[in-house]
Amino acid sequence: MSARVTVVGGGVIALLTAVECVLEGHTVTVVDQGPIPHSRATSFDQHRILRALHPADPRTTEAALRAHRRWVELEELFLTRFYEQVGALTVLPPAAAADGAAMLGDAGGSARELTAAGLSDRYPHLHVDGGLGAVLEDEAGVLLAERVLAACVGWLKWQRGIELIEHRAVTAVDAESGSVRLVDGRVLHGDAVLVAVGPWSRGLLPQAVAERLTLHRQSLLYCRVPRNQARAWAATPAIPALGTRGGAWLIPPVAGTALKLTSATACRVVDDITDYATDPYWQRKLEKEFGDILPGFGPAWVTAAKDAYYTSFTDTGGPLLVALGGAGYAYAACGGTSFKFAPLIARSLADRLTGRSPSLIGLGALDGPPLDVHAPQLAGL
C-alpha cells in the first residue's frame, strides 16, 4: 500500500531517503528552507571520503563495504558518475595496520598492508611519522558530494509522485497526525514524516532532545597543488587518517576538485550556527599543521577556506535517530560520518517510515531502538 511521506531537509540523508521511498512506490514531498539540494547542508561540499576500514570494529567495517556496493548501484540508477574509486589510506602503528588489513580481508574487502618504508617510497609527497605503517584499501575513494546531491534531485524530478518544495522553512512538525507546518502557513499532510535537517535539527525537536545534541564547527582548507607535484597527487588515495597526534586527514584533488585539508584540532563545539567564514586563527593553525605533513606546503597553496557545521548525540558522539510519535522520525545528528553510510541509513529510515521492519545495516544508531520523545525520562524534563 502506498504511503504519503513528507521529508524535511535538503541534504544527502533526506534526499536518499526520498529516493528509497519513491523506489518502493510511495508518494513523497521534500521540503527545505533553502534550495534543494541545500547549499548550506552539512553534506553539500566538493567531496567526502568513502572508506571501509574502521580499526578494531569489524561490524562497522562490514557496513562500510555494503555502503560501497550501494554507492556503485546508485551511480547506475542515477546514470551519473560521482564515486572516484581512488582507494583509501589509513596510517596506523604497524601492529594495528596488520590487524586492519586482516580484518578487511575477513570482511570480504581488498586491502594491503604498507610498511613504513613502503609508505615513504609510494608517497614521497607525504611526510609520515617514520614508525608508522598503513592500510591501503581498493574498494574505497572519494564521493563527489555536490554531484551526489544534484544526481538525487535530478532523478527525483523525473519520478511520479514526488513534489519538491524549496525556500519554505518548516515551523512545526506534528508527527502523530503526520502534518508539517510551513512558514507561509501551508500545512502538509501525510502518513509519515522524516526530519533530516542536520545542524538545524535542534529548532524542530522537543527541548529535551535538542539539549542532548552537540553542535560542532569544522574549519577546512581547499588547495591547489603545485604543478610539479600534480602527478604524485593524481595517484594519491583518500587519507582518512595521517597518523598525526592532531587527527589530520585529507582528500586528494580528483575530477577537478581541490585538495582538501583538515584536522580534528580544527573542530570545536559551538552554541549556534553563525557564519561560514574561517577565522584567520584556524586557517593559520591548519596551515602550520599541514606544513609538517606535506613537503613544500604553505599558505600559497590555499585557494579557499570555509567552516561547516554538524551535530552529534552528546551521549555517544555519534548519530541519533529519534521517534517523534506516530510514523514520525528525526535523523537528528550525523556524528560527522553519515555521508558514506547514507545509502544504508536511507534504506533503514524508509523502512520505518513506510511501516516495514527496518533493514539491519550494521550501525548501532539505526539498528537499535530510536530515542523516543515520549519516554518518561524525556517527557519529565
Identify what each model region corresponds to:
Residues 1-13, 29:
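Beta1/beta-strand and adjacent pyrophosphate-binding region of the FAD-binding site
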Residues 19-23, 81-83, 199-326:
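Active-site substrate-recognition segment that forms the wall
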Residues 91-159, 163-166, 172-174, 313:
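Flavin (FAD/FMN) cofactor-binding and adjacent substrate-gating region
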Residues 295-381:
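C-terminal catalytic lobe of FAD-dependent flavoproteins
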Residues 171-188:
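Conserved beta-strand-loop-beta-strand element in the redox core of flavoprotein oxidoreductases
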Residues 22-43:
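Glycine-rich FAD pyrophosphate-binding loop
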Residues 47-122, 247, 270:
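Dinucleotide-binding Rossmann-like beta1-alpha1 core, especially the glycine-rich loop
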Residues 6-8, 31, 187-200, 346:
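Short hydrophobic core segments
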